[in-house]
Each structure stands twice: as C-alpha cells, then as structure tokens.
Amino acid sequence: MMKKITVFLFLAVSLFFTSCKSSVSVKPSAVGADFDVSISFGSAFCGLFSAVFPSEEGGETRSFFDDAQITQMLTATGIQNVRVKSNGQTSLQISGSAAASGNPLVDSGIIVFAPDGNVSLVFSFQNLQALYGLLPFELASYIDMLMAPAFTGEEMTDGEYIDSVATVYGKNVADELNDGEVKFNIHGTDARTNSSSLSAVKLLNVIGTVRFCGKRAGEND
C-alpha cells in the first residue's frame, strides 16, 4: 500500500499550489496564539499529486492526507492542541496553538507577540530562512521542492520564479501558483479582525518585511 502524503510534503507545497481559496487565521489565546489554516486545492495541484500518488489497485479514490499522521507530526514540532480535518483530495483544515517559545513558528520570528497581548505574523527573508533552519531534515528537503527564493536565497524576479516552477512542474501548476492568494485574518485582543491578502508568489519571493498585525496601524497601546 502506497504511503499517503505526509505532513512534510503538505506543509512545503500545498499551501501555495492552490486556487485563491487559502486562508490563515491567528488570534491570541491562553496558550499563546491559536491558528487555523484552511486550504482548497486547485485542479492542477490535484493532478500533480494524483500522478505522484496514483490510485491503488481497483481504482478507488483515496485521500492525499492522513489526518492522524499530520496531527502526530505537528505535535512533535511543539505545536499544541492540533486538529486536522481533510476532505478527500480537495481541502484540508489544520488548527493548533503555538506557545511563546518551543516551536518553529515562534522561534523563527514568524509569530510575534506584542506586550499588549496582540499577535502578528511577520514574513521576511531572514525569518523564513530561520524557519528553514529550525525544521527537521525531511521537512527542509520537501521545502526545497518549492524552489522558493525565500528559502534558497537565490535572487530572481517573480516572473523568473514562475518560469522555473513551470519548467519543473508544468505550466498549469505554475499558473495556479501565480494566481494563488492567501488571506490572513489576524484577530486582536479587542475582538476585532484585520484581514489582508498576499499572493503566494510574493510570499515565496518575499522582499523586505511583510507584517500582518492584530492591531490597526496608528492605534495606541
């Protein structure tokens, strides 16, 4: 029986090879920060992984994901309260909690806690490189599949990056990546939500620092 896709391959690839239906929500909690990642997969992504993980004998359709395995592997990284729900080959939802230290999301500087209790997501070349360095070898190896400048350190334009993806994975996958967008919902301590979107390519080829905050710009502590 062929292995189902592991959480490592999912984390490295699936969030970005999608249609425009990915979202990330983060809010302060007693643990530190609760997060929820919701992903709907595009047809090119599904086709790519159907080729890598073909149907078993008898032609029965099976899920790309093993919910229990994903839960176990995320828990092993220091993420708490992990919950995973997949829907065959079309969608995946993962939620969990990140404490103030002891997990790659916080230790890399991607999740940042403010003195007032609000939470931010911060993406830069430096902290994505830090995240890469904190991950186990297997996960880092799958991240290499993205060929993302933010992880490889190679300087290239967004167009050059898309072209390189098309060369390796095909035009349809590259087009989905180019059209992909991630919506970020950052919930503040005052129960208000700041929502912003960023293209997948701008995230994988990040320049400078991109910050999504739980407090609106200009608000005082």
Give the ranges of each region predicted by the language model.
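C-terminal motif of bacterial Sec signal peptides marking the signal peptidase cleavage site
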Residues: 16-19
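Mature, soluble, non-transmembrane domains
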Residues: 75-221
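Post-signal-peptide N-terminal segment of Sec-exported extracytoplasmic proteins
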Residues: 41-72, 135-138
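One face of beta-strands
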Residues: 22-26, 31-39, 96, 119-121
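Primarily extracytoplasmic ectodomains and periplasmic/lumenal surface modules that are beta-strand-rich
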Residues: 30-35, 40-49, 101-103, 191-192
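Sec-dependent signal peptide recognition
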Residues: 3-10
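Position-driven detector of the extreme protein N-terminus
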Residues: 2-3, 178
